[in-house]
Amino acid sequence: MALGVREYRNISEIKGPLLVVEGVSRVAYDEIVEVETAAGEKRRGRVLEVGMGYAVVQVFEGTTGISPTGTVVRFMGRPLEIPVTEDMLGRIMNGLGEPIDGGPKIDADERRDVNGAPLNPAERAYPEDFIQTGVSAIDGMNTLVRGQKLPIFSGAGLPHNRLAAQIARQATVRGEEEEFAVVFSAIGIKYDDFLFFKKFFEETGALGRVAMFVNLADEPAMIRLITPRAALTLAEYLAYERDMHVLVIITDMTNYAEALREISAAREEVPGRQGYPGYLYSDLASIYERAGRVKGKKGSITQMPILTMPNDDITHPIPDLTGYITEGQIVLSRELHNRGIYPPINVLMSLSRLMKEGIGPGKTREDHAEVSNQLYASYSRGVELRSLTAVVGEESLSERDRRYLKFADLFEQRFLKQGERENRSIEETLDIAWEILSVLPEEELVNIKEETIKKYHPKYRAG
C-alpha cells in the first residue's frame, strides 16, 4: 500500500484520543498518520475507521493541545512498520519497536508491517517437539509443545510475573539451545514491574537472547494494542527468516483487552459482554493465531500469553474467549499461593491439549504419559480426601486413604514447589514424580504398565 503522503487541515471533531478528518480520499484502514499541531509538535496516529469522505484517526500520544484550526494531518500511505533484525535480541524497546535502553539506534535493512503477513492455513505444520521450561508442573503435566499457544490464567497479586521471567530465562528446545530466542512483550505494566524484569534478565544472563517490548501503564492505550503485534512481527522474522525457535511471552492480555474496550467506547461502538467490543474474539485471535509452524521452515513461534482474571473469574470474557482460541491453559491458584507454594499452578484445572505430541520416546521419556496420568488421578483423589477429612476426621480414614493424603502433601511440596531459579530437566521432574508415587501401594498405580513400574519405580531401581 504505497499511496504517498497526503495532507489535510480540515478536522471536524476531536473526542478523547480521536480526530475526525473530513474531505479525505484514498485513505486506508490502519494507515499510519502524522499529526502536526499549530505549535509545530509532531505526533503519530493510525486510521481506525474510513467512511465516505472522512477518516477517524487515533492519536498515539493523545489529543491534548490539538485544536481543529492550525493542525495538519498527514496520511503517510503505509501501515505501521518496525525494523527487524537479530540485533534486537538483548535490547529493550518500547511498544513501537524503538530502543529505550540507552543503546544505539537499531540499524536494520528490513522493516515489516506490525500486522504480520497472511499465512495460508494449508501451509501450517502441526505443533510438535517438547519445549523444556524447567518448571515441573508444566513440563511434567501440562507440556508446552513447539508451535503451541498455551496461556497462563492468573489473578491480581499472584506471581505470574515471576513465573513469566523464570520461563523466559529457562525455556529451551532440547538439543537446539543456540537457536532458541525469547520475545517478551509487556503491556500496560507498572514501572516497578518493568524494573523487575529488566533486573532479573540482566542478573541471570538471559537478556542476551531476549528482545523486550515494553509498554508502561502511563502510556497511551493505542500503544497497548500495537505492542504485542510489534513483538510478534520480530518473532515471525526470527522464526521464518532466521530459522530460530521463538517463545513469545505476552503479559498482560487483560490490559490489552481493557485498552480495546476504552478505544471502542471512544468510537461509540455498540458494546458486547461487560462493555467489551463484539469483535474481542476475532481481535484476540489475530494475536494468538500468529503462533505456529510453517511447512518447509525450520523455525517456529510458541506463545505463552498471560492474563489476570478479574476477581479470579475464569468465566470472564477475556479468559473465556482466550480458552476457545488457544490450546489449553495453565491456571494459577490463590489457595496454593497463600500456602507458600511457588509456582502455585493448579494442575487439576490446567490442560495442554497438544501435550501428547511433544512427549514420549525420543522427545522426553517413555514413561512420561503414564506418570502424568497417574499423578493427575492420585492427586485428584488426595484432594477429595482432604475435603472428606475436614468432615469425618483423619482417624476415620483407611490406611490406603492416609497414603493418598500423604501423596497430595508430597506432590505440592516436592513436585509443584520449586525455587524461582531452579531449572529442572524433564528427567529430574519425572524422577521426583516416581519418588512421591512410591508412597502409594504399588497396586494403586493403575495408570502405569507393570513393565514401566519395574523399570522406573524407586523400589526396583534401588535393587
Swiss-Prot record:
GO molecular function: ATP binding; proton-transporting ATP synthase activity, rotational mechanism; proton-transporting ATPase activity, rotational mechanism
Record InterPro entries: ATP-synt_VA_C, ATPase_a/bsu_AS, ATPase_A1-cplx_bsu, ATPase_F1/V1/A1_a/bsu_N, ATPase_F1/V1/A1_a/bsu_nucl-bd, P-loop_NTPase, V-ATPase_su_B/beta
Keywords: ATP synthesis, Cell membrane, Hydrogen ion transport, Ion transport, Membrane, Transport
Topology within the bilayer: Peripheral membrane protein
UniProt GO cellular component terms: plasma membrane; proton-transporting two-sector ATPase complex, catalytic domain
Keyword Cell membrane assigned: yes
Subcellular location: Cell membrane
Pfam families the record matches: ATP-synt_ab, ATP-synt_ab_N, ATP-synt_VA_C
GO biological process: proton motive force-driven plasma membrane ATP synthesis
Primary localization: membrane
Family affiliation: Belongs to the ATPase alpha/beta chains family.
Quaternary structure and partners: Has multiple subunits with at least A(3), B(3), C, D, E, F, H, I and proteolipid K(x).
Entry-linked NCBIfam families: ATP_syn_B_arch, PRK04196.1
Listed name of the protein: A-type ATP synthase subunit B
Organism of derivation: Aeropyrum pernix (strain ATCC 700893 / DSM 11879 / JCM 9820 / NBRC 100138 / K1)
